[in-house]
């Protein structure tokens, strides 16, 4: 706030708001990220601070990597390109947000078109 500039980048999931059976804890935690993003983006805009959410799909690390090969294939088959994302896709989105002073309260999907 003292610098009158900042970027808040929250991470969520492109599946996080679907609300499938058995995902109450996961879904509510992801929706909480969306809610706090909305508040931050409005409260801190006057300080030139923006807040956005990256909605990630299947990337070959984290939760995806811990899944069985069969489950990974099942998830990848839902992606139109049939492949997982690369970390450079996330880096590119972060760079875009950092350099954009008018992108605020946005939810940017990086999920291969899910």
Where are these regions (language model features)?
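Hydrophobic structural elements of the Rossmann-like NAD(P)H-binding subdomain
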Residues: 9, 51-54, 64, 105
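Active-site helix of classical SDR
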Residues: 29, 37
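Alpha-helical segment proximal to the catalytic Tyr-Lys
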Residues: 42-46
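Conserved SDR Rossmann-fold cofactor-binding beta-strand/turn motif
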Residues: 50-60, 109-111
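Catalytic Tyr-x(3-8)-Lys segment
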Residues: 70-88
């Amino acid at each position: 706030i003292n610098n009158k500039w900042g970027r808040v980048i929250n991470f969520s999931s492109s599946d996080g708001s679907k609300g499938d059976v058995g995902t109450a804890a996961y879904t509510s935690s992801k929706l909480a990220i969306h809610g706090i993003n909305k508040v931050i983006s409005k409260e801190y805009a006057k300080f030139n601070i923006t807040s956005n959410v990256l909605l990630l799909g299947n990337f070959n690390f984290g939760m995806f990597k811990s899944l069985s090969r069969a489950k990974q294939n099942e998830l990848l088959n839902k992606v139109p390109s049939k492949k997982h994302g690369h970390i450079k896709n996330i880096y590119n989105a972060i760079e875009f947000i950092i350099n954009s002073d008018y992108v605020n309260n946005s939810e940017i999907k990086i999920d291969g078109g899910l």
